From Swiss-Prot:
Chain residues that bind thiamine diphosphate: 65
Keywords from the UniProt entry: Hydrolase, Magnesium, Metal-binding, NAD, Thiamine pyrophosphate
GO MF term set: 3D-(3,5/4)-trihydroxycyclohexane-1,2-dione hydrolase activity; acetolactate synthase activity; flavin adenine dinucleotide binding; magnesium ion binding; thiamine pyrophosphate binding
Protein name: 3D-(3,5/4)-trihydroxycyclohexane-1,2-dione hydrolase 1
């Protein structure tokens, strides 16, 4: 048996270079590169291996471990899970910073390979710098926290353990049914230890992502259920995009006259103008999709996890005879809502169902309902685009909260811009193939409802974990995945302040991204939630501490985000009017460096809900009558919702 003497880290790098995936006959390198932040826990081990021979891996320098791992996840998401990035950090706080990103990737079923440094396997220098000592178990380190948020976790305590660990890692990373974060912990001493690795460990490996076919029995059951139903609706989930099944879904909708709503992950699989595309569905959905869904007697979920935002906490589907067919590669997700399960690749399942339903000449009984619903939403969308602040007589979309003191925000922000009007203009002015990236705050709701996707795969929303601070890093990852397209991070001031470190990396790599920063001086989405459930405004506006009340109810904070970003070398713009916004967007397209447009918008001018409800933990007992009323409303809504 031929062997090669290498360190554990060197063997890991060589192995990663030999991994390929094949999908529909197309073969490509699986691991494009590796994001790094070096510290004592990885620099002389994995760092040395990368310096000596990185192979074809592109080595990127991150600025924050969570940021770079978010970028890695966004890259894989934009690549539809067919190519990924790895990330390496030092021990302790460096590795802990990636835990949030691991959770984000696993919640979204997006593959990312995390390689955190770890404490010494020998324990000789214990406690090493940045080590946590647990007196009840000395084998525990910070990296054990990854267990809860990883789809596969391992620790390499001996060099030869690397082989089985990495084979299992690749199994999970290339498994569409159960992929997510894979964490391989690398004790810093073991990284540098040498071993005689068998040459066959480094052979080229092609991981074929196969399309699972539906069984005849599940297919027959699905056909039997569908043919009994008159008003079905489909839900286009992220699985449609990852399985590249958009054309088949369109064919299914057109052939059988069945409309579909979109989840955050599924949006832009098919252009918004398609006659059967109702748009966003659920809590952050629009009036068209939610109206049709309420009356549907069959819900066909395609590649969706049926989150509470999709089902409106299982209260959306109000037809007493409603049943569910779930087409999903994952048996776990297919099993939800007591559905009839079709465990299969979305494309293969749809193609087979098309053949079977054509035999019986099936067609839904919709007449004008689909067109009427879409027309109603287009009318509402036009209204949202044209909302303008008019002074004291102005009623914001989210009314009854700040109605009396919006002028205070007008003065503080120096702007009368409404968020819905801003989004409308941005949607009009961006290139058709531009990619928008979002994750948290009020923007995901506005974008799922309002954004018209004119080209496929241009809407990139991380809403499986709704990770605050994902947006800027996510834009960088999407730009690395699609360097020829303009990429825009759609981010609020709250999320931007949490994390925007990889804006600097975008400059370093000459990967131009555009940050569209909506500043309403607060955590506006959560302020809506608390006040909508009977509370006052508490801890969600960005105000100075009042020296008299000792509370955060002083003057509104004024932050010049453009000036801050300009210090990095970003091209920046201040926007307080639609004309300034138009000029900034046009000029930003001409730039070769990353840009940031600081857009001051009034709070409460985002969209509000449409025919949906969201279950949150309202206080059962309170001195506040408004909180008591909110609790009673919750109880009433729960009576209309499924129990599971």
């Amino acid at each position: 048996m031929q062997t090669v003497r290498m360190t554990t880290a060197q063997a890991l790098v060589k192995f990663l270079n030999q991994q390929y995936v094949e999908f529909d006959g197309k073969q490509q390198k699986f691991i494009k590169g590796i994001f790094t932040i070096f510290g004592h826990g990885n620099v002389v081990g994995l760092g040395q291996a990368l310096e000596e021979d990185a192979g074809e891996l592109e080595v990127y320098q991150g600025r924050n471990e969570q940021g770079m791992a978010n970028a890695a996840m966004a890259f894989a998401k934009q690549k539809h899970r067919k190519q990924i990035m790895a990330c390496t950090s030092s021990v302790g706080p460096g590795s802990a910073n990636m835990i949030t990103s691991a959770a984000t990737a696993s919640a979204n079923n997006i593959p990312v390979l995390l390689l955190p440094g770890d404490v010494f396997a020998t324990r000789q220098p214990d406690p090493v710098l940045q080590q946590i000592e647990q007196t009840h178990d000395l084998s525990i380190s910070t990296n054990d926290a990854f267990r809860a948020v990883s789809k596969y976790w391992d620790r390499i305590n001996r060099p030869e353990q690397l082989m089985t660990a990495m084979i299992q890692a690749m199994r999970v990373l290339t498994n569409p049914a159960d992929t997510g974060a894979v964490t391989i912990c690398l004790p810093q001493d073991v990284q540098g230890e040498a071993w005689d690795f068998p040459s066959y460990f480094f052979q080229k490996r092609v991981h074929r992502i196969e399309r699972r076919l539906p069984t005849k029995a599940s297919l027959a059951d699905a056909v039997e259920m569908i043919k009994r139903k008159k008003k079905p609706v489909m839900i286009c989930g992220g699985g449609v995009r990852y399985a590249e099944a958009a054309e088949e879904l369109k064919q299914f909708a057109e052939t059988f006259h069945i409309p579909f709503g979109e989840t955050q992950a599924g949006k832009s699989a098919i252009e918004s103008s398609h006659p059967y595309n109702l748009g966003g569905i659920g809590v952050t959905g629009n009036i068209a999709a939610n109206t049709i869904a309420k009356e549907a007697d069959l819900v066909i979920g395609i590649g969706t996890r049926f989150t509470d935002f999709t089902t409106a906490s299982k209260q959306l589907f109000q037809n007493e005879e409603v049943e569910f067919v779930n087409i999903n590669i994952s048996e776990f997700h297919a099993n939800k809502l007591d559905a009839l399960k079709v465990i299969a690749d979305a494309k293969e399942a749809l193609l087979t169902l098309i053949d079977e339903l054509q035999v019986i000449d099936y067609r839904s009984s919709y007449t004008v309902e689909i067109a009427d619903a879409k027309e109603a939403w287009e009318t509402e969308l036009s209204r949202l685009h044209n909302i303008r602040f008019t002074g004291q007589d102005f009623t914001p979309e989210v009314e009854g909260h700040f109605d009396g003191n919006l002028n205070e925000y007008v003065d503080a922000l120096g702007s009368q811009l409404t968020q819905t009007a801003v989004i409308g203009q941005i949607n009009t002015l961006l290139d058709e193939d531009a990619i928008i990236v979002g994750a948290a705050g009020s923007l995901p709701g506005d974008l799922q409802r309002m954004w018209a996707s004119r080209k496929p795969n241009t809407y990139h929303m991380e809403y499986g974990y709704s990770c605050m601070g994902y947006e800027v890093a996510g834009a960088l990852g999407a730009k690395i995945a699609e360097p020829s397209k303009e990429v825009y991070a759609m981010v609020g001031d709250g999320s931007y302040q949490m994390l925007h470190s990889e804006l600097v990396t975008s400059l370093q790599e000459n990967k131009k991204i555009n940050v569209l920063l909506f500043d309403n001086s607060g955590f506006g989405c959560i302020n809506n939630l608390q006040m909508g459930n009977g509370m006052g405004s508490f801890g969600t506006e960005f105000r100075y501490r009042n020296q008299e009340t000792r509370k955060l109810d002083g003057a509104i904070m004024k932050i010049d985000f453009a000036a801050s970003a300009a210090g990095y070398g970003v091209k920046t713009y201040h926007v307080t009017s639609l004309e300034q916004l138009r000029e900034a967007l046009i000029d930003a397209k001409k730039q070769t460096v990353s840009t940031l447009i600081d857009i001051k918008v009034l709070p409460k001018t985002m969209t509000n809900g449409y025919e949906s409800w969201w279950h949150v933990g309202v206080a059962e007992v309170s001195k506040s009558q408004s909180v008591q009323a909110a609790y009673e409303s919750k109880v009433s809504n729960l009576q209309q919702a499924r129990s599971y």
